[in-house]
């Protein structure tokens, strides 16, 4: 079982006299920077000179520098850039400014685990990964609570990497909800698996296939959308709040019996084998290699799939339905 650390077990001592550079000011970046700053820690933000976020970060009361300047000024450097951009920025702007005893931090282990970034041996390397999007990390912090987070130490050059990681997650509010210790390998492989197999890939494919099945059978697309997509949130919220048991307890007996008897026929042994194959490709690095190569040529496959998704009938119908629901929260975190 994972070890869980709470607020009363941690202090800010390991970061008290250090400067923390947050590289990036997107969804996670703005939340980390503002939470750490409001926790009384010394925070700077590293951005490109041309970044539209420069003025935003300054307006939020933060000191902003270029990435290279921030790396040179900082003791702890948290890289909160897209996975595919991290290595190039690291080698061109961060690595030349690293000093022995500095700490490199990540919110996801992809680049370290798959050796896209190979840090020098004389710096600490740790992970601080909140299990929620940036706007939730920020909102819950301001409410006096927080979201759970993961920590991991990949390299402990100073002998103090774990304490720095714990002070960091305390600063973003995560210890209020509980912090779980893991490894870079475990976080990376389980995170990618979840994204691909159920949270993003599996769920979206299940929704689209169910929608297409109803429409092909002659049902109105609007009815198909409500039953296969719109109501997903109702079910997911129940699971999020109380697990599968809460969900089964809350739905009708008809839904419970039908779901329990038919569900295993849909997600069956063939599906399980496909999941094992997806996990194998994550573990052996095949997926990482494919993704890195795709990024090197500016993501042509991803862009084509995004266009196809946007044109899918489910998306067209869904957009029309959502436009007619005035109370629906349509806030999108573009970052």
UniProtKB/Swiss-Prot annotation:
Keyword list, A-Z: Amino-acid biosynthesis, Branched-chain amino acid biosynthesis, Magnesium, Metal-binding, NADP, Oxidoreductase
Family to which the UniProt record says this protein belongs: Belongs to the ketol-acid reductoisomerase family.
Record-annotated KARI N-terminal Rossmann domain positions: 2-182
Taxonomy, superkingdom: Archaea
PROSITE patterns: KARI_C, KARI_N
Keyword Endoplasmic reticulum recorded: no
HAMAP family: IlvC (MF_00435)
Listed cofactors: Mg(2+)
Function in brief: Involved in the biosynthesis of branched-chain amino acids (BCAA). Catalyzes an alkyl-migration followed by a ketol-acid reduction of (S)-2-acetolactate (S2AL) to yield (R)-2,3-dihydroxy-isovalerate. In the isomerase reaction, S2AL is rearranged via a Mg-dependent methyl migration to produce 3-hydroxy-3-methyl-2-ketobutyrate (HMKB). In the reductase reaction, this 2-ketoacid undergoes a metal-dependent reduction by NADPH to yield (R)-2,3-dihydroxy-isovalerate.
UniProt cofactor note: Binds 2 magnesium ions per subunit.
Binding site for Mg(2+) 2: 191, 227, 231
Organism: Methanosarcina barkeri (strain Fusaro / DSM 804)
Entry GO MF terms: ketol-acid reductoisomerase activity; magnesium ion binding; NADP binding
Enzyme class label: oxidoreductase
InterPro entries listed in its UniProt record: 6-PGluconate_DH-like_C_sf, KARI, KARI_C, KARI_N, KARI_prok, NAD(P)-bd_dom_sf
Entry protein name: Ketol-acid reductoisomerase (NADP(+))
GO biological process: isoleucine biosynthetic process; L-valine biosynthetic process
Active site, renumbered: 108
The EC number(s) this enzyme carries: 1.1.1.86
One Pfam family named in its UniProt record: KARI_N
Binding site for substrate: 252
Enzymatic reactions: (2R)-2,3-dihydroxy-3-methylbutanoate + NADP(+) = (2S)-2-acetolactate + NADPH + H(+); (2R,3R)-2,3-dihydroxy-3-methylpentanoate + NADP(+) = (S)-2-ethyl-2-hydroxy-3-oxobutanoate + NADPH + H(+)
Chain positions recorded as Mg(2+) 1 binding sites: 191, 195
Annotated positions binding NADP(+): 25-28, 48, 51, 53, 83-86, 134
């Amino acid at each position: 079982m994972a070890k869980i650390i709470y607020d009363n077990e941690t202090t800010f001592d390991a970061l008290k006299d250090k400067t923390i550079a947050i590289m990036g000011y997107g969804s996670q970046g703005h939340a980390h920077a503002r939470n750490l700053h409001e926790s009384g820690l010394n925070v700077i933000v590293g951005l490109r000179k041309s970044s539209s976020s420069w003025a935003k970060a300054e307006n939020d009361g933060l000191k902003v520098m270029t990435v290279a300047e921030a790396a040179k000024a900082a003791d702890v450097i948290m890289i909160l850039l897209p996975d595919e951009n991290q290595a190039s920025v690291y080698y061109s702007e961060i690595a030349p400014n690293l000093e022995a005893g500095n700490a490199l931090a990540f919110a996801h282990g992809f680049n370290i685990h798959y050796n896209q970034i190979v840090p020098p041996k004389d710096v600490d390397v740790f992970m601080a990964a909140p299990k929620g999007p940036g706007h939730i990390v920020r909102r819950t912090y301001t409410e006096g609570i927080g979201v759970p987070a993961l920590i991991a130490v990949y390299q402990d050059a100073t002998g103090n990497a774990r304490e720095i990681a714990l002070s960091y997650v305390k600063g973003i509010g995560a210890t209020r909800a509980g912090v779980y210790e893991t490894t870079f390998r475990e976080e990376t492989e389980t995170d990618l698996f979840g994204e691909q197999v159920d949270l993003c890939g599996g769920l979206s494919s299940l929704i689209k296939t169910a929608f297409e099945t109803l429409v092909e059978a002659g049902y109105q697309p609007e009815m198909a959308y409500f039953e296969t997509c719109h109501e997903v949130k109702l079910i997911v919220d129940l699971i999020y709040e109380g697990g599968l048991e809460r969900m089964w307890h809350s739905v009708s007996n008809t839904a419970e019996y039908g779901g329990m008897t038919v569900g295993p026929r849909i997600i069956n042994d063939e599906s399980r084998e496909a999941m094992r194959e997806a996990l194998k490709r994550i573990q052996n690095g095949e997926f990482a290699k494919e993704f890195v190569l795709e990024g090197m040529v500016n993501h042509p496959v991803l862009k084509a799939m995004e266009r196809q998704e946007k044109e899918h009938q489910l998306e067209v119908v869904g957009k029309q339905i959502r436009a007619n629901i005035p109370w629906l929260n349509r806030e999108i975190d573009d970052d």
